[in-house]
């Protein structure tokens, strides 16, 4: 609907089994402006994410979706910016590749965000 974008945040976290339930809104990130659409009773939300962090996704059928580690970091980055609650105590992190998560954190190269994730004991 709104390109370029990939499914991430709550929708990807739910898909990967990191959170329970499925959000009402299909949540995606985009390097473009934040937008929302209501189509046939379904809400699609697109949240701006810096173009330099527009990676870590893969093709799933006809759409792009963040891998589990990138979905966590996308969500936490928005929490860091005050746009989401930092409620990772509700996340099931048992299947997460911790080495990949650390690599991705290094790739994001934002020291304030890194300190934020360290305080969360990610």
Each model region followed by its residue ranges:
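Nucleic-acid-binding surface
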Residues: 1-122
């Amino acid at each position: 609907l709104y390109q370029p974008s990939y499914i991430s945040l709550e929708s990807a976290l739910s898909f990967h089994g990191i959170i329970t339930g499925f959000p009402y809104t299909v949540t995606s990130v985009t390097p473009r402006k934040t937008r929302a659409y209501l189509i046939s009773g379904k809400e699609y939300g697109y949240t701006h994410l810096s173009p330099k962090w527009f990676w870590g996704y893969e093709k799933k059928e006809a759409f792009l979706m963040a891998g589990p580690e990138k979905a966590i970091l996308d969500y936490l980055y928005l929490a860091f910016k005050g746009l989401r609650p930092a409620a990772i105590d509700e996340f099931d992190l048992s299947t997460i590749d911790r080495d990949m998560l650390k690599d991705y954190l290094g790739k994001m190269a934002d020291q304030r965000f890194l300190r934020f994730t360290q305080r969360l004991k990610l």
